[in-house]
């Protein structure tokens, strides 16, 4: 098993979730966390990189939210790596992802990333109804930690 699989399985057990990553690194594990987002565990075999992705569940993603996310891509540092936002064109949906080399990956990355993903999903829900400030006006480290 890769570092990624071992760490992901340990993390899932720690939050009382039973879905486990299999030995097949080609697959992805998608966990619907709440109505706003899903967490995706994936692995890029070509670069031996672990991919932690937050997917926003509404399709298409609200344009105000997309604009904020894309304008602020690469501005959030989580667990020593950039949280990069992007757009899946086929579904007009946004995502955020962190890519970490498998050789560096351990369960502490997941423990640091998961709460940030939860906060991003809460912010996302607030922006959709006009209740959240724009990301650009915030102190990012304080906003997400």
What is the predicted function of each stretch?
Residues 39-58:
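A short acidic-to-branched-hydrophobic micro-motif
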Residues 129-145:
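Short, highly charged C-terminal tails/helix-capping segments
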Residues 68-78, 99-132:
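Ampiphathic alpha-helical segments that act as solvent-exposed interaction surfaces
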Residues 1-39, 79-82, 86:
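Charge-rich, low-complexity N-terminal segments
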Residues 48-49, 60-61, 103-106:
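A short local loop/turn or secondary-structure capping micro-motif enriched for an aromatic residue
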Residues 94-98:
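Short, aliphatic-rich beta-strand segments
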Residues 54-93:
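Short, internal acidic amphipathic alpha-helical interface segments
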């Amino acid at each position: 098993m890769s570092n990624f699989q071992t760490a992901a399985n340990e993390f899932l057990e720690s939050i009382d979730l039973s879905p486990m990553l299999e030995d097949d690194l080609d697959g992805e594990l998608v966990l619907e966390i709440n109505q706003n987002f899903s967490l995706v565990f994936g692995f890029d075999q070509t670069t031996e990189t672990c991919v932690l992705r937050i997917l926003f569940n509404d399709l298409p993603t609200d344009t105000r939210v997309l604009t904020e996310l894309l304008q602020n891509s690469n501005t959030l540092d989580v667990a020593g790596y950039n949280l990069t936002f992007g757009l899946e064109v086929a579904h007009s949906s946004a995502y955020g992802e962190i890519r970490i080399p498998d050789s560096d990956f351990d369960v502490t990355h997941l423990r640091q990333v998961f709460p940030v993903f939860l906060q991003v999903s809460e912010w996302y829900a607030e922006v959709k109804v006009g209740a959240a400030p724009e990301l650009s006006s915030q102190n990012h480290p304080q906003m997400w930690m």
